[in-house]
Curated annotation (Swiss-Prot):
Comment, domains: Possesses an unusual extended V-shaped dimeric structure with each monomer consisting of three distinct domains arranged along a curved 'spinal' alpha-helix. The N-terminal catalytic domain specifically recognizes the glutamate moiety of the substrate. The second domain is the NADPH-binding domain, and the third C-terminal domain is responsible for dimerization.
Assembly and interaction partners: Homodimer.
GO annotation, biological process: protoporphyrinogen IX biosynthetic process from glutamate
Protein name per the record: Glutamyl-tRNA reductase
Positions annotated as active site in the UniProt record: C46 (nucleophile)
General function of this protein: Catalyzes the NADPH-dependent reduction of glutamyl-tRNA(Glu) to glutamate 1-semialdehyde (GSA).
Family of this protein: Belongs to the glutamyl-tRNA reductase family.
Length: 401
C-alpha cells in the first residue's frame, strides 16, 4: 500500500527543526530506507518533511527504523502523522497543488515535488505504483497551476518578506545563503529600487554569476563586518545550526529587521531581546497578510475539481492494473487457439492463397473477441463488478487445464 509519513501541520518550529532531513544525505537515506520499504520518495523542503513509500504493512517497529535512519528522537512520535492508501494519495495531490503550504498556493512546491520524484527515480528507489502516483500528481499540479492562473499572483516566503521590508522603507539589505530560496530572494529584491545588497556565501564562484552593481558578494565569515549597518537581513541557509547569534547584533544602532526563512532556524531567538531588532521566523512570516490570500483561495477552491479528476484517473489506473495478469493470460490463450486453428487449416488446405486468407480471417476474428472481452472486463472493473465478470469470461475463453 501507499503511505505517507510527515510532520503534523501545527507542530511548533522548535520541534520541526529537530525533524529535518539533511539534503547532503538524501541518497544515503533512500538506500537505507529501501531495506524496509518497496519504494520511497523523500519530500524535504525548508518547511516540509514528508516520506512517501510503498509497504505491505506499518507497525511501530517500522516507524522506529525510519526514525533511526533519520536520527530522529522517537519521543517526537506524537508530532508525526501517517496516512495510508486513498488518504495518502489525496494528501500528495493537495500538497502538489499548494493546499497544504504554510503560504497558501505558494509557487515553489510543484518544483520541489518534481525534484524529489526524480531523485528517487534516478536512484531506482521507485516501484511502479509509487512512480505512477507521482506522475499523476505532478501532471495534476501543472494543470491546476495553469488553469487556476496562480502564476498571475505568485507568492512565496521570499516574495512576502521582500515586499514587507520594502513597505517598511528598508534600503540596505543582506541575504545569507544562495540556494533556491536565496536566489529567489535576490530576484525579488533586485526588482525593487534598493540601494545595495550584501550577499554572504561560502562559494566564492557565485560572485561570477552576479552582474548587478548593487550587489556586494562577500565571504560568509565576513558578514558580521556589515550586518549592523543593514536595514534588513534575510537568512536562508541550509546550515544545521544558528548562523546569526545574539552577540552578532549591536545593542545600539538603527532598527533592523531580520527574517529567518530557514528550518532549522538560522537566527538566535534571543536577538528579539535587543530593542532595535525584530526577528520573524518562517511561522511568523506565514501569518503576514500578503494582500492576495483571499484571491488565491478563491481561485484554488474553484478549480479543486481538477485535483479530483486526476485522483480518479489514478484510482482507475490502479484498479485496471489489478486485472493485468488476467489480460495477459487471455492474450496468451487467444494466440494458442489461433495457432492451433491455423495449423490445422494448413494441414488440410491444398492452396497457399487460401491459407493466407484464412490466416487473416482467423486472426482478425480472434483479436476482435479478445479485445471485446478485455473492454468488458475493464468496464466492469471500474464499476466494481470485476470478480463476477472475471469468472464468466474465464469460463468462456480460458479452458480448464
Amino acid at each position: 500500500m501507499i503511505a505517507v509519513l510527515g510532520i503534523k501541520r501545527n507542530t511548533p518550529i522548535e520541534i520541526r527543526e529537530k525533524l529535518t532531513i539533511k539534503a547532503n544525505k538524501h541518497d544515503e537515506y533512500l538506500d537505507r530506507l529501501l531495506k524496509y520499504l518497496d519504494g520511497v520518495i523523500i519530500l524535504a523542503t525548508c518547511n516540509r518533511t514528508e516520506i512517501y513509500f510503498n509497504v505491505s504493512f506499518i507497525n511501530e517497529e517500522l516507524l522506529k527504523k525510519i526514525f533511526e535512519i533519520f536520527n530522529w528522537n522517537y519521543s517526537y512520535r506524537k508530532y508525526i502523522f501517517i496516512s495510508e492508501d486513498k488518504k495518502a494519495c489525496k494528501h500528495l495531490f493537495e500538497v502538489t497543488c499548494g493546499f497544504h503550504s504554510k503560504i497558501l498556493g505558494e509557487d515553489q512546491i510543484l518544483g520541489q515535488v518534481k525534484t524529489s520524484y526524480f531523485k528517487s527515480l534516478n536512484a531506482k528507489a521507485l516501484n511502479l505504483e509509487l512512480q505512477r502516483l507521482f506522475q499523476y500528481a505532478i501532471t495534476c499540479g501543472k494543470k491546476f497551476k495553469s488553469q487556476s492562473r496562480l502564476f498571475e499572483i505568485p507568492v512565496s516566503s521570499a516574495s512576502i518578506v521582500v515586499n514587507e521590508s520594502i513597505n517598511k522603507d528598508c534600503k540596505k539589505f543582506m541575504v545569507l545563503g544562495y540556494g533556491d530560496v536565496g536566489r529567489l530572494t535576490m530576484k525579488y529584491l533586485l526588482a525593487h529600487n534598493i540601494n545595495e545588497v550584501y550577499l554572504a556565501v561560502r562559494n566564492k564562484k557565485i560572485k561570477d554569476e552576479i552582474v548587478d552593481e548593487r550587489v556586494n558578494v562577500i565571504d560568509f565569515e565576513e558578514k558580521n563586518k556589515y550586518i549592523n549597518d543593514m536595514d534588513c537581513v534575510i537568512s536562508c541557509t541550509s546550515a544545521p545550526h544558528i548562523v546569526i547569534k545574539k552577540q552578532d547584533i549591536n545593542n545600539i544602532g538603527d532598527n533592523i529587521l531580520i527574517y529567518d526563512l530557514a528550518v532549522p532556524r538560522d537566527v538566535d531567538d534571543e536577538i528579539n531581546d535587543i530593542d532595535r531588532a525584530q526577528v520573524y521566523n518562517i511561522d511568523n512570516i506565514s501569518y503576514i497578510n500578503d494582500g492576495n490570500k483571499k484571491m488565491r483561495f478563491d481561485k484554488m477552491d474553484s478549480n479543486k475539481f481538477i485535483l479530483e479528476n486526476y485522483l480518479n484517473e489514478y484510482y482507475e489506473w490502479k484498479r485496471l492494473r489489478s486485472i493485468a495478469p488476467f489480460i495477459e493470460e487471455l492474450k496468451v490463450t487467444s494466440k494458442e487457439i489461433y495457432d492451433k486453428r491455423i495449423t490445422t487449416f494448413k494441414n488440410k488446405c491444398k492452396y497457399r492463397g487460401d491459407v493466407d486468407l484464412a490466416n487473416k480471417m482467423i486472426k482478425s476474428t480472434s483479436d476482435y473477441y479478445m479485445n471485446r472481452a478485455i473492454e468488458i472486463m475493464k468496464e466492469e472493473t471500474l464499476k466494481g463488478s470485476e470478480e463476477e465478470c472475471l469468472r464468466i469470461i474465464k469460463s468462456i475463453f480460458i479452458a480448464k487445464k
